[in-house]
Amino acid sequence: MPRDGGPLPSQQKLQEVTASCKRKSWPTAWARGRAGPAMWLGVLQLLLLLLVDPPTTSTEDPAFPHLGDSSQPPPRACPWRCSCPRADTVDCAGLDLKVFPDNITKAVRHLSLQNNQLQELPYNKLSRLSGLQTLDLHSNLISSEGLPDEAFESLTQLEHFYVAHNKLTVAPQFLPRSLRVADLAANEVVEVFPLTFAEKPLLRSVYLHNNQLSNTGLPPNTFRGSEAITTLSLSSNQLSRLPPGLPASLEQLHLQDNLISKVPRGALSRQTQLRELYLQHNQLTDSGLDVTTFSKLHSLEYLDLSHNLLATVPAGLPRTLAVLHLGRNCIRQVDAARLRVARGLRYLLLQHNELGASGLPAGALQPLRSLHTLHLYGNRLQRVPPTMPRRLRALIMPHNRVAALGARDLASTRGLVELNLAYNHLASARVHPRAFRRLRTLRSLDLAGNQLSRLPAGLPTSLHELRLQHNHLRALEPEMLAGLDQLRELSLAHNQLRVGDIGPGTWHELQALQDQQAPYDKHLG
C-alpha cells in the first residue's frame, strides 16, 4: 500500500485504461453492437497487461518492517503475568501463583518463582527444562511430596538451587553434580540423604540453617566427594555434636544455636583452611573440648564460643586467631598460658563471665601485643587489669566493681582511644588526680553511673565525648573544663547540680560544644 494512502498502482492504471478507451472509437462501435471477436480479444489482452505491475525502482527502505514481513523474529513466549527480560530468563516472583506456570520456554536458564504460594512442582513441567541453571523457589509452600526427586535427574546443568522458607521435611534424595549453591534453610528438614550433597565436585555453598536436623539426620558420608565446599551453615538445628566427615575445604562453618556439648576428637583436624567458626549458643563445657580441638585450624581468624558453659579459656588456640569471643560463659579465671599462643589476637571479648578479683592475673594479657579491644563488662573485677598490652585502643569494662583508680593503673595503655568504666563503684576521693594524665589520645571517656561528686582532675585535652550522667556531681567550675576545647558531647544528666552550682563562664570553655551545637546535656537534675 502506498505510504500516502492513495490507490494501488494497478487500480490507477485501470482508471487510465478506462479513460483512454472512452477517447477511442471502438467504445462507440461497442455501443453500436459492431464489436467483433478480434476487438474483444485485443481489449482483454490490453487489460491483462496493464493490470500487472511492471518492474520499477523502489524508493522505499528495504529494511522497513512491513506487515507480514517474515524477516522479524516472532515474539518470545512468556508465561502470563511473568516477565522475560532475556531469552533465557523467566521471572515469576511475587505473583501469588498457586500452580506452576505454563508456557515456560525450554530454552530457559534462570527461573525465578520465589514469594508465591506454590505447593508442588509437576514432574512433567520441571523435567523438560533440562538447560536450567538457576531455580529459585524461595518462600513458597512446597512440601517434600511436592518436589519430585526424579525431576532433578533431568536438570543436569543446574548450578543454583534456592528452596529456603518452604515446608520441606526431608531434603531431595538427589541433586545434580553440576550444583554450586544449595539453599534449603528455614524449612522443617529432619533428614539429608547420601546423594543430596555428596559427589558434587563444584558445590561451594550449602545452607541448612533453621531446620530440625539432629545428628541422626546427617549420615557420615553427607559431603563425601564434595571437596570444594567453602561455606556450610548448620546453625539453629538440633545437633548435639559436630557432624563427622566435614569437607576439608571449609572456610566458614556456622554451628551456632544448636545443642552441641562436645566436639569429637579429630572432628576439625582436616579443616586447615577454615577462617571463621561459629559455635555460640550451644552447651559446650570444658570437657567437651580438648587441646587438639582447634590446634589444626592453621587459618582460623574468628572463633565465637559465647553463650556456652565454659569455665576456662580453651586450650590449643591457633596463632592466627584475630577475634576470640568468650562472652556469657562461666569463666572465673583467665589462664595466661592458654592465651599466650594466640599472639595475633586483636579482639578479646570476655563480657558477662565470673571474673573476680583474681580473674585476670597481672601480665596475663601482656603477651597479646596486637590486642586492640578488650571487653570485660558485666564481671566482678575490682580494679583495672594491671600491665595490659601497649597497643590497646579500647578498654570496655562497665558494670564491674572497680572502686579506685590509681596514678599508674592506666600507665601501660597510653594509646587508649576509648575507656568505659561506667556503672562501677568509683568515688571522687579514690580517683587519683593523675589517673588519666598519660592518656593523650583518649577521645571517649564514660564514667556514668558511679559515685563521683566532682569532675576528675587532669582530663585529657583530646577528649571528644565525656559521659558523667547518674553521678553525685554538685559543682561545675570553668577550671575543671579548661583545655577541653575538642569536647563535642558532655552528658551531665541525673546529678545534683543546680543553676547556682555552675560557675560563670563554664560553657565558654567548651568551644566545640557551642560552635557545633553538639548534643551536650545541661540537665540539672
Task: Tell what function each PLM region has.
Residues S127-Q212, P219, T231:
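A generic tandem-repeat structural signature
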Residues W80, C84-R86, G94, S144, ...:
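Disulfide-rich extracellular modules and peptides
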Residues L95, N116, N140, V163-N166, ...:
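Consensus "Asn ladder" position of solenoid repeat domains
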Residues P2-T89, A93-G94, A107, Q117, ...:
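Terminal targeting and flexible regions in eukaryotic proteins, enriched
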Residues N124-R128, P148-S154, P172-S178, P194-K200, ...:
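A structural signal for leucine-rich repeat
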